[in-house]
């Protein structure tokens, strides 16, 4: 007879095996959540000023990803965090979702796109909820969110699509294999936040005043 903990592990293992065989369900679910979040935001009555801000920041974030040619050394996560911190979770989340969707027109669309949309959208939303004010707090937030959160979810996606088994050991193997890329991404995010936080926030504060946008 199984103990409570062993029964839980037994059920988790069998659920994991089922999920590994039906990972497309998870991909569709994440895509649905990401698109639903976008639709829910746009369903409300938007002012022209809000559309201008979202479009402008999304264009900057997409350009930051496309025009920097060093693999994984991209400023877009930093731009998303700054957007959320300046304008709140709704704008930060939308900029993140659109960054993943639009930039992959250049990099290629695939089953990874909804995962990236979800990661960047939630990072922008959390940055907005935290209302980051200090540069150091933004740098630390960006470093760990890029390394642990974004990297963890994308490594999980890699395991779903490229792994032969589905368990914690397989996941750790993908984490170890991807640690170099994740460190480049997290260090780039921290560096661009350190260099761009103050000048970027000053310009966004003027934009908020100009368009009369309040958090």
Question: What is the meaning of each model-derived region?
Answer:
Residues 1-29, 113-115, 129-215:
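Membrane-embedded alpha-helical hairpins and interfacial helices in multi-pass inner-membrane proteins
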Residues 2-81:
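Hydrophobic transmembrane alpha-helices
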Residues 35-39, 76-92, 125-130:
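Generic transmembrane alpha-helix motif of multi-pass integral membrane proteins
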Residues 47-50, 89-94, 133-138:
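Membrane-helix interface segments
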Residues 55, 59, 78, 82, ...:
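Residue-level signature of the transmembrane alpha-helical core
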Residues 62-77, 97-131:
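Interfacial aromatic-anchored transmembrane helix boundaries in multi-pass membrane proteins
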Residues 63, 67, 86-87, 187:
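Transmembrane helix irregularities
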């Amino acid at each position: 007879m199984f103990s409570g903990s062993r029964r839980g592990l037994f059920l988790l293992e069998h659920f994991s095996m089922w999920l590994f065989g039906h990972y497309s369900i998870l991909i569709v679910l994440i895509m649905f959540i990401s698109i639903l979040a976008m639709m829910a935001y746009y369903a409300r009555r938007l002012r022209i000023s809000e559309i201008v801000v979202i479009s402008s920041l999304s264009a900057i974030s997409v350009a930051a990803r496309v025009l920097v040619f060093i693999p994984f050394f991209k400023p877009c996560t930093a731009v998303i965090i700054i957007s959320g911190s300046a304008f709140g979770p709704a704008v930060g989340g939308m900029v993140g979702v659109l960054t993943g969707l639009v930039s992959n027109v250049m990099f290629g669309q695939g089953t990874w796109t909804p995962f990236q949309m979800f990661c960047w959208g939630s990072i922008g939303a959390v940055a907005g909820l935290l209302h980051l004010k200090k540069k150091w707090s933004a740098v630390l937030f960006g470093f760990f969110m890029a390394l642990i959160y974004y990297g963890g979810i994308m490594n999980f996606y890699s395991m779903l699509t490229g792994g032969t088994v589905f368990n914690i050991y397989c996941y750790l193997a993908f984490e170890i294999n991807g640690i170099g890329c994740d460190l480049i991404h997290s260090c780039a995010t921290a560096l661009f936040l350190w260099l761009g936080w103050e000048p970027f926030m000053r310009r966004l504060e003027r934009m908020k005043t100009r368009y009369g946008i309040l958090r």
